[in-house]
Amino acid sequence: MKLAELKDHMQKSVEATQRSFNTIRTGRANASLLDRITVEYYGAETPLKSLATIGTPDASTIVIQPFDMGSIGTIEKAISLSDLGLTPNNDGKVIRLNIPPLTAERRKELVKVAGKLAEEGKVAIRNIRRDAVDEVRKQEKNSDISEDEARDLQEEIQKLTDQSTKRIDELLAAKEKDITTV
């Protein structure tokens, strides 16, 4: 495995963790809160953003305008069944989600959720590192590379791993600050 390829894999894990963080609710309205929601539409699970326009007219409201008015009921149901804790208001044309301020208890829960997501990202990075180190050891065993080259590669792999986990820690700190800021 080439170092550039390895760096790319680790970067993708960091980006996936960032996207996961975006789905965690803070006190402000954000359309990415609805990224994980899928709706049963003509027998298939379809992402909500494929079925409607999602906007945030102000800091405490999300407005969902379905492309097909026949799907408004199923969209409303999918939001109600999600773990977001939001109650949809359907006026027949659009669905409004009012984002209530978070309680201190809910903020603590969300910080824990963010911590779990960060840990999942770090595990993914460690798995990438493990696979890369195994590959280097295999090449060394087959005499494709020298012992010194293997050691240098393993050090480079570790540097990339440290950079990626540090980036996830930075993202986590920023998300925790965002969640706990009233």
Curated annotation (Swiss-Prot):
SUPFAM superfamilies: Ribosome recycling factor, RRF. The keyword Ribonucleoprotein does not apply. One of its GO terms (biological process) is translational termination. Keywords: Cytoplasm, Protein biosynthesis. One of its GO terms (cellular component) is cytoplasm. It is found in: Cytoplasm. One of its GO terms (molecular function) is ribosomal large subunit binding. Its main location: cytoplasm. Pfam families: RRF. The keyword Cytoplasm applies. CDD domains: RRF (cd00520). InterPro entries: Ribosome_recyc_fac (IPR002661), Ribosome_recyc_fac_dom (IPR023584), RRF_sf (IPR036191). NCBIfam families: frr. Responsible for the release of ribosomes from messenger RNA at the termination of protein biosynthesis. May increase the efficiency of translation by recycling ribosomes from one round of translation to another. PANTHER family: MITOCHONDRIAL RIBOSOME RECYCLING FACTOR PSEUDO 1, RIBOSOME RECYCLING FACTOR. Belongs to the RRF family. HAMAP family: RRF (MF_00040). This is Ribosome-recycling factor. It comes from Synechocystis sp. (strain ATCC 27184 / PCC 6803 / Kazusa). The lineage of its organism: Bacteria, Bacillati, Cyanobacteriota, Cyanophyceae, Synechococcales.
